[in-house]
Amino acid sequence: MRKGIHPEYMECKVTCACGNKFEVRSNKPEMSIDICNECHPFFTGSEKILDAAGRVDKFKKKYNLG
C-alpha cells in the first residue's frame, strides 16, 4: 500500500442512544448510533407489534370507505 493516502485506523468509542458504550476500530475517534445489540428488538427478544388492523380501520373511517 502507498504511504500517506490512507486514513488512520484507530480505536473508536461508540455510544448508543440507550446508553450502551463499546469500542471498535474505525477511521473516526468516536461515533454515536441510534440502536445497538443491547436495545434492538431482534437481540432483546421483545418485539413491538404494530396495530395494523387498527390503522386500516382508522384510514377507512377517515376517508369514509366503509
From Swiss-Prot:
Residues reported in the UniProt entry to bind Zn(2+): 16, 18, 36, 39
Cofactor note: Binds 1 zinc ion per subunit.
Any one annotated GO CC term: ribonucleoprotein complex
Keyword set, alphabetical order: Metal-binding, Ribonucleoprotein, Ribosomal protein, RNA-binding, rRNA-binding, Zinc
PROSITE patterns reported for this sequence: RIBOSOMAL_L31 (PS01143)
InterPro entries listed in its UniProt record: Ribosomal_bL28/bL31-like_sf, Ribosomal_bL31, Ribosomal_bL31_A, Ribosomal_bL31_sf
Cofactor(s) it depends on: Zn(2+)
Membrane-crossing segments per the record: none
One MF term in the entry's GO annotations: metal ion binding
Keyword RNA-binding tagged: yes
NCBIfam families associated with the record: L31, PRK00019.1, PRK00528.1
Family designation: Belongs to the bacterial ribosomal protein bL31 family. Type A subfamily.
Subunit record text: Part of the 50S ribosomal subunit.
HAMAP family with a match to the protein in the record: Ribosomal_bL31_1
PANTHER family (UniProt xref): 50S RIBOSOMAL PROTEIN L31, CHLOROPLASTIC, LARGE RIBOSOMAL SUBUNIT PROTEIN BL31A
Record function comment: Binds the 23S rRNA.
Stated name of the protein: Large ribosomal subunit protein bL31
Organism listed in the record: Sulfurovum sp. (strain NBC37-1)
